[in-house]
């Protein structure tokens, strides 16, 4: 099926996730299939939890030619202290140019499914700062996670959080985050 789908110019990769335990990194079939993505210049989107982020780094090490997009800031909970597995993996991600962070899922990380997730960048800065520091302006992309995000905050709030945060980084960084990086990746 991968050969059939990858023949279409709009097919850019696959998204996978939903593991209760670790990623199947040591399974030969899984490794073979991941290598096929890299061979076809396709990306792997990972929908994983904060505790699984170190495994995304291991994939990046094993497959340096594969673009790996980590979805929803790796579903890190919006509370301090941040999980050590997440903070260590964010620091390690700096060394892997094939790892990309989709900055989304922030309001969901608050757990406030009654629509009252906080607005503005300030409540999320302790998550956004280490991500921006590790991934830089070239390896982050915007994601809304709409319509799921609507349970936690209106779309305007979701957009406003990252717009406020990235606006202070300059027009070029903001343009890369919202548009150009996604077009390039």
Which residue ranges define each predicted feature?
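Catalytic alpha-helical scaffold of carbohydrate-active enzymes acting on polysaccharides/glycoconjugates
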Residues: 1-9, 29
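Glycine-rich phosphate-binding "P-loop"
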Residues: 8-25, 147
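Short Gly/Pro-enriched loop/turn and capping motifs at secondary-structure junctions
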Residues: 106-108, 146-149
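Mid-to-C-terminal alpha-helical segments outside catalytic/metal-binding sites
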Residues: 129-130, 134-141, 150-185
